[in-house]
């Protein structure tokens, strides 16, 4: 055992003197490797008688543990010293300019959505949302659209083969009007909301896509009349297009969910081959352009939402967000909105730092 003690003392001294991980590894192999002196000492236990083995085994195991602990402690110290040396050489110069990164851009639809929300928030409207997969009761029946209404046809609406727990057919919503029904049933009256979002119809050409964006507005209160509707739309369009010469023309129309119903035209002129909203459509060089549909909410729709139409009245309107973006920012093909062409996005996208505010003007700055 005297030889084992001497070997241990020599090994501990060599371990403490190791100045690198490689040198430390050599000491580990010399002591604890398959042919190391500790391993060889352990192998001698097999040739000892039981009494001798009972005394020698704990002593050898104690030496083995002491050497292993010394190696582990020295390894931690060497790794810590190496890390400190590395950190001392790797300094960060905070005066250096940051590397230039390419910023993404805000899609025109997202930009216009933000502009709409900013304007209507100033008018006291809240933003309401709802599911894009709807049942036919919320999408059609509750909006006074009969079973025979053309909009329910398969060639206009994307239906799912499934039905809900009440047997209602499921579909991709064709407008955001179901949000109005859900909001009235959940919140009651009075209510003042806009409902922006994606809608789906089976149509595709330069001005129509199977999926597009729509915003609808709803006001339910006492003593509401058509004059309130016209003022709201005029105020909104003046703020959105940032022009005071917005002139509207209301034409009688028909929508099953409003009565009376009106189509809203806006005066415009052509400048550089594009339509520019503003001015009287009857003036020289101007014309009228249909912009949106609106009207006073039908009594049956108010009843469907669980409200008393003798106490509560209201108006609603709906228009395409994509079309608004095209008119304001000069795009000419709706399909390009969804192509994902990076060149188009680079040209028409907006800075993420350009947040629309009424104080600075909601339009994106070039």
Swiss-Prot record:
PROSITE patterns: AA_TRNA_LIGASE_II. CDD domains: PheRS_alpha_core. Its cofactor is Mg(2+). It catalyses: tRNA(Phe) + L-phenylalanine + ATP = L-phenylalanyl-tRNA(Phe) + AMP + diphosphate + H(+). One of its GO terms (biological process) is phenylalanyl-tRNA aminoacylation. Mg(2+) binds at residue 259. Keywords: Aminoacyl-tRNA synthetase, ATP-binding, Cytoplasm, Ligase, Magnesium, Metal-binding, Nucleotide-binding, Protein biosynthesis. Its EC number is 6.1.1.20. It is found in: Cytoplasm. Its main location: cytoplasm. Tetramer of two alpha and two beta subunits. This is Phenylalanine--tRNA ligase alpha subunit. It comes from Erythrobacter litoralis (strain HTCC2594). The lineage of its organism: Bacteria, Pseudomonadati, Pseudomonadota, Alphaproteobacteria, Sphingomonadales.
């Amino acid at each position: 055992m005297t030889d084992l003690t001497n070997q241990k003392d020599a090994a501990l001294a060599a371990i403490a003197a190791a100045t690198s991980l490689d040198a430390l590894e050599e000491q580990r192999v010399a002591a604890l490797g398959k042919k190391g002196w500790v391993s060889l000492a352990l192998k001698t236990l097999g040739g000892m008688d039981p009494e001798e083995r009972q005394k020698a085994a704990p002593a050898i195991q104690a030496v083995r543990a002491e050497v292993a602990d010394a190696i582990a402690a020295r390894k931690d110290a060497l790794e810590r010293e190496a890390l400190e040396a590395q950190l001392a050489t790797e300094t960060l110069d905070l005066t250096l300019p940051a590397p230039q990164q390419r910023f993404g851009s805000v899609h025109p639809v997202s930009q216009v959505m933000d502009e709409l929300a900013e304007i209507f928030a100033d008018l006291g409207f809240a933003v309401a949302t709802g599911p894009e997969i709807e049942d036919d009761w919320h999408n059609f029946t509750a909006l006074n659209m009969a079973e025979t209404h053309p909009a329910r046809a398969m060639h206009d609406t994307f239906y799912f083969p499934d039905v809900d727990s009440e047997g209602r057919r499921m579909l991709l919503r064709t407008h955001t009007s179901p949000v109005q029904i859900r909001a009235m049933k959940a919140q009651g009256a009075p209510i003042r909301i806009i409902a922006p979002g994606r809608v789906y119809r089976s149509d595709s050409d330069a001005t129509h896509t199977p999926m597009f964006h729509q915003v609808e507005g709803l006001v339910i209160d006492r003593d509401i009349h058509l004059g309130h509707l016209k003022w709201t739309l005029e105020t909104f369009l003046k703020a959105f297009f940032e022009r005071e010469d917005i002139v509207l023309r209301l034409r009688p129309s028909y929508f099953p969910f409003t009565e009376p119903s009106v189509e809203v035209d806006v005066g415009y002129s052509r400048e550089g081959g594009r339509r520019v909203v503003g001015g009287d459509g009857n003036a020289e060089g101007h014309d009228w352009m249909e912009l949106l549909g609106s009207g006073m909410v039908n009594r049956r729709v108010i009843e469907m939402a669980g409200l008393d139409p003798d106490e509560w009245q209201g108006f609603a309107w709906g228009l395409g967000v994509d079309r608004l973006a095209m008119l304001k920012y000069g795009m000419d093909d709706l399909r390009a909105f969804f192509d994902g062409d990076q060149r188009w996005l680079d040209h028409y996208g907006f800075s993420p730092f350009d947040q629309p505010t009424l104080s600075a003007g909601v339009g994106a700055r070039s």
